[in-house]
Amino acid sequence: MTDEQFESCMLRMANGDRQALREIYDAYLNLIFAVIYNTIRQREEAEDLTSEFFIKLYGLAASYRSGNGHRKWLTVIARNMTIDRIRRLDREI
């Protein structure tokens, strides 16, 4: 997906278009899961976080600003969510 296509999907999502989320999900599910799994190394947690990621992305659609490459932006969000989860799990131990 190009930056322009991604930006279009984010704009559509900001206007309530769930099909746009499906397009991003189909394009980036494997990438996001890989980023999360490679950080947390627990399949079930990675699956949960991947689902949470796309829910969060839908909520971020209206505030998305293009410019720095959407793939990097997506992976930073996924990695930060994973690190937050690891910290929360460590506190529970």
List each language-model region with its residue ranges.
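Charged, alpha-helical scaffolding/interaction elements associated with membrane systems
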Residues: R12-N15, R88
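Structural recognition of an alpha-helix C-terminal capping motif at a helix-to-coil junction
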Residues: A34, D48-I55, G59, N68-N80
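Arg/Lys-rich amphipathic alpha helix in sigma70-family domain 2
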Residues: A62-S66, V76-I93
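Hydrophobic/aromatic residues within well-ordered alpha-helical segments
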Residues: I24-Y28, I32, A78
